[in-house]
Amino acid sequence: MATKRDYYEILGLPKDASVEDIKKTYRKLALQYHPDRNKDPGAEDKFKEISEAYAVLSDTEKRAQYDRFGHAGIDNQYSAEDIFRGADFGGFGDIFEMFFGGGRRGGPMGPRRGSDLQYDLYITFEEAAFGVRKDIDIPRTERCSTCSGTGAKPGTSPKRCPTCGGTGQVRTTRSTLGMQFISTTTCSTCHGRGQIIESPCPVCGGAGRVRNKRTITVNVPAGADSGMSLRLSGEGDSGEPGAPSGDLYIIIHVMEHRHFKRVDYDVISELSITFTQAALGADVMVDTLYGKVKMNIPAGTQTHSVFRLRDKGIQRLHGHGKGDQLVRVIIKTPTKLNQEQKELLRQFENLSKGKKPQEEEKSKAEKHKKGIFEKVKDAFES
């Protein structure tokens, strides 16, 4: 399957483009590539591509989802028709017909599509990082098994509506000032279904649907983050007889972790070290999502220094590598010192503030200073 182009690239706009700029650019490109105006073989495909980009970027919610998760955020949350639903295409009212042959889901006539449902799913930090399968219980309307969704009593069947002849629509013609006006309305006898039920099903009362609780398995991909939405097509409420079911939208909420935070696909953590480890350097063990990892603290490290552990972050959506773990070190300052520790620190301070020795004494001083530091380390880490 061909990779979709970036929506901003399609419209030739920067990512911070205003809604007004997006609309203005769309109108210009739509006029240029509309199949009624442009007879080039690729014009219709280009027009569809432009219209899809506009439908997403002109909608605040869809644009935010796209900016955060890319095409995966749109494809996981919206059906093909939902992408275009609600978009203002100006004078290009044939968009829906061009894409879907005029079949508008949940339109004003005919049996109604089932309602979409939403479920808030809470997962742990680790589950978001590595992915998880969750079984959830969803209360929803389903097709009645007694009447197989027809709404009619077993052994009987719905009859064609005598008022509309099974179309679900009634056309009315009236003449005014010598001109004829034709209007089409939903049939009031069958309420747009085209059928009437003379003997309703005793279980569903003729609705063709009943309320049930269904267990559904949700596959949360590795790299999921709070605010991400997963669309499960057809897992919403059942539609009226002859109409499709709605969709189920799973909204992801990632619970906070005691030690880790997340920025995009990077993991942020803190590590406390002693001031002797910071001054002399040391190898320390760091907790990661993948277990403990050895990390080197170089001599002279300052508090709040940040070290990067490559590929110890979170799996990117759809398997394109991992983020890193950023470890910020915090140097612990001792609060209770015994007499020996105080004396050693005073000796070290005196050496640090002392005048530079002569060349022949420098070596001795350096050795003495090192000896003091080793004593300090032993005193504070024993």
From Swiss-Prot:
Record family assignment: Belongs to the DnaJ family.
Sequence ranges of Basic and acidic residues compositional bias: 371-382
Residues of the signal peptide: none
Name listed for the protein in its UniProt record: Chaperone protein DnaJ
Cofactor needs: Zn(2+)
Organism: Methanosarcina acetivorans (strain ATCC 35395 / DSM 2834 / JCM 12185 / C2A)
Subcellular localization: Cytoplasm
HAMAP family on file: DnaJ (MF_01152)
Residues bound to Zn(2+) 1: C144, C147, C201, C204
PROSITE patterns listed in its UniProt record: DNAJ_1, DNAJ_2, ZF_CR
Region annotation Disordered: where it falls in the sequence: 146-168, 348-382
